[in-house]
Amino acid sequence: VEQKEIGRTYRYVAQELELKMEPVDPKQYVPRFASELELSEEVQSKANEIIDTTAEQGLLSGKSPTGYAAAAIYAASLLCNEKKTQREVADVAQVTEVTIRNRYQEQIEAMGIH
């Protein structure tokens, strides 16, 4: 069974049972991704800052929290000179490189970093 189908079924059951579902905070993924990529606390802190700043601007709406966190980790790794490739980050986060690229572009534009 595909992960997408499980998620869809979970949302359906939760809706039918009128369960309150809180949106997942992308910052919950930062420590795990950073640990698996052997990145520093500085990178984690910068990634959380990127998430906070860009989410305040409404960029998170409708986006996958895992992809969003992964892109923030990628951006933070570059900014802190602990470079990881999009492929490395995508593999750890189980998202595509295209997702990393798209969210990264949105985040750096929103942060005013070009």
UniProtKB/Swiss-Prot annotation:
Sequence repeats lie at residues 1-17, 28-109. GO terms for cellular component: transcription preinitiation complex. GO terms for biological process: transcription preinitiation complex assembly. GO terms for molecular function: TBP-class protein binding. Keywords: Repeat, Transcription, Transcription regulation. Coiled coil: none annotated. SUPFAM superfamilies: Cyclin-like. PANTHER family: TRANSCRIPTION INITIATION FACTOR IIB, TRANSCRIPTION INITIATION FACTOR IIB-RELATED. Stabilizes TBP binding to an archaeal box-A promoter. Also responsible for recruiting RNA polymerase II to the pre-initiation complex (DNA-TBP-TFIIB). Belongs to the TFIIB family. This is Transcription initiation factor IIB. It comes from Haloarcula vallismortis (Halobacterium vallismortis).
